[in-house]
């Protein structure tokens, strides 16, 4: 399979230093809203990268559920591979691939676990089917067949048919405290625009990176 000629030109315009705010969140919010307005599929989907104890990286797609000055939030099974990695190494990387609007955002940081109150508030806002699925899946564990997972789901669906679904003790969330955030805008002739915000003490440094 020859992939060498699969490429396209980027024509949507550049990104200039004078257009950047002093802090990264206003620009992220603007770009995310533009991704939503452009009807990009799953605009809040982000690649989450962690490393195991041997240094082997792993990636998976997770949905961003909230962001503010305190960090970026996502939820997961605390028995999952990503959670195990983060228990040994709190460093993490997030990546938003908004190809349709010729943009990417890359974030590095460290995680902290969310409080039980924050977890409960979000869990109870989920559809009941999703709440039950959280109970049914021992995420990242090997299973014999899909039928085993579906059978467990149906069993729990019957168990929780009446009343509320409690928050599993093995389910939680993380807040990513940002160390850096890079904004990438596609440019003509592969002269892409890249700016990185690096957090130092109480301020952000902004640097242009070569494409």
From Swiss-Prot:
Under the heading PANTHER family, the entry gives: PYRIDOXINE-5'-PHOSPHATE OXIDASE, PYRIDOXINE-5-PHOSPHATE OXIDASE
Q: Which GO terms describe its molecular function?
A: FMN binding; pyridoxamine phosphate oxidase activity
Q: What is the protein named?
A: Pyridoxine/pyridoxamine 5'-phosphate oxidase
Report the protein's function: Catalyzes the oxidation of either pyridoxine 5'-phosphate (PNP) or pyridoxamine 5'-phosphate (PMP) into pyridoxal 5'-phosphate (PLP).
Recall the taxonomic lineage recorded for the source organism: Bacteria, Pseudomonadati, Pseudomonadota, Gammaproteobacteria, Vibrionales
Q: How is the cofactor bound?
A: Binds 1 FMN per subunit.
User: Which amino acids does the record list as binding substrate?
Assistant: 7-10, 65, 122, 126, 130, 190-192
| NCBIfam families named in the record | pdxH, PRK05679.1
Q: What keyword terms does UniProt attach to this protein?
A: Flavoprotein, FMN, Oxidoreductase, Pyridoxine biosynthesis
Primary enzyme class? oxidoreductase
